[in-house]
Amino acid sequence: MRLSRRRNGFGPLDKAVAIVVPLVLIAVGVVVYLLLRPEDCPGGLGKHGGECVGVTESAFDGDEDLDGLIRAVADENARVERAWEDPEQGQAPMPYGRIALMMPFTSDEASAMTAAMIRRALAGAHAAQLKANSSGGPHYQLLLAPDGKDLDQWRPVVDDLTALVDDRRSPLVGVMGLPSSTPETRDAMKELSARRIATVGPVITSADMNAAYFFKTSPNNSMFVDALGHYLKRNPGDRKGFLVYDSRPDDVYSRNLHRLLQKKFGKAYGLRQRSASYLGSTGPAAGIPQRFQSAAQKICLTESDTVFFAGRDQDLPALVKRLSQESSCDRRSPVRILKVGIGLEPTLTTDELTGMLRETRTRIVAAASVTPAWWTPRGLPAKGAPAGLGGFLRVFHDLDERYGIGEKPLDDGYAIMYHDAFTLLSNAYDRSYSEANEKPGSDDRTPAPARTPTKDDVYNTLINAGIVERDGRLLCTNCLQGAAGTYAFEQSPETHQWPICKPIPVIEYPAQGRGGPGKTYRTFEDTFAYPCP
């Protein structure tokens, strides 16, 4: 038997194989990885500044607590598209429009929105979407438009939104969100307005956040301060005031509120002589935030009974805690902290903070868009609640049971105000669609194909939902019957697209138990001869 002799070393063919085979394996591995790897930015979003931003109707990765809600919105969006593209047998295609929710979907400790705020805002917008889609058409997709946790990646988002406005089949109805009064939000607001896209800010309150196409469902800081003025006329206290303000120069909200409080109450409450600043926690690193030791000492040494707070709600618990630790305070005299905002942040009503407030005889007085007094402990509308609250509560409670929106999910007002912002746009599109497809004369046939309103039609409908006077009273013309009240908008240099006749309740926490804050202030009511409807 002849045995083969083993060669010693590599020949030319061996060397070629040794080189080619690893290269082929590497190439195959790269292809497999590219095919199977998770997308950098799912849902068609793009990577900008290290974050996934853009506009999508599909699911993507936000904060972990948002996963269920984001998937729910994506599923509803897919259902809406199927009802138009491939309706069930025997059903006519259901036309639909698109409303974009432009805000962060991720957060960190310095973000403009906390994770809890984002969750409540998304739940409110989705509740409005479900409510709108439960009735006759048109129906709506809720596009998700993440613009970065610091709101600074808005440019590619605005470009993506602009590309949707000329879609005649399923047009962009408008944009909602822009959740914080920052320089970045102001730039985004102005750019959307320049492109003539109707935009609604659900929780914008800085009085100088104005542009022709920018509508606000919340009152602004000036209106909140006026509501506090009405409260103080009834409850003046000892007029020994003190102003605590956020010193960040780039915080549009806090700077605007600081100026307004000084202007309104500076002389009567001695705020020019008694004030202290602190560094707010929202924004880039600039030192140690929430240092309230100096403010607390000065409040106690001056025996101030009325503290005006010009800062964000995230920082207020730290002030309350520092005041409770201040040994120089005379606990015999009550102190009240006056603030403005969308509602009552749950961090202000924890058992721990409530105990501190009671022990130190301190009370928070808040002029707000929303008050917990509007609903009962069982989650039903209370006496005197806005007409549109009940329908929202029914849908929202179902979402809360399924996805767990969080503790006291209504109290800060975000869910309610985001609901109203979506509803404002969907109502305007509904009316524009109906008018565009009115049946001429006695013809009861719908025009075929149905006419689709443009973004300009939606804007013109929005600015004509106003208040008129008749027979000694005021009447609404297409007012929004929102979960936060019945209010209107009109094109006027006086109103700047801020809500007309929006209620501003004043909240006392812990509650006094008697008396109460008095009559509810309504925006622009003093410009009319008769009470708001």
Short names for language-model regions:
Residues 1-98, 473, 479, 501, ...:
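Long terminal accessory regions outside catalytic cores
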Residues 326-420, 437:
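Extracellular/periplasmic periplasmic-binding protein-like sensory domains
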Residues 116-120, 135-208, 497-498:
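Beta-alpha junction/loop-to-helix N-cap segments that form part of ligand/metal-binding clefts
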Residues 200, 207-230, 354-381:
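Short beta-strand elements at the ligand-binding edges of bilobed clamshell
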Residues 42-156, 417:
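N-terminal extracellular/periplasmic Venus flytrap/periplasmic-binding protein-like
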Residues 165-180, 197-202, 242-246, 299-319, ...:
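Periplasmic-binding protein-like
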Residues 214-283, 305-306:
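An alpha-beta-alpha
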Residues 405-412, 426-516, 531:
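Segments of small-molecule ligand-sensing domains
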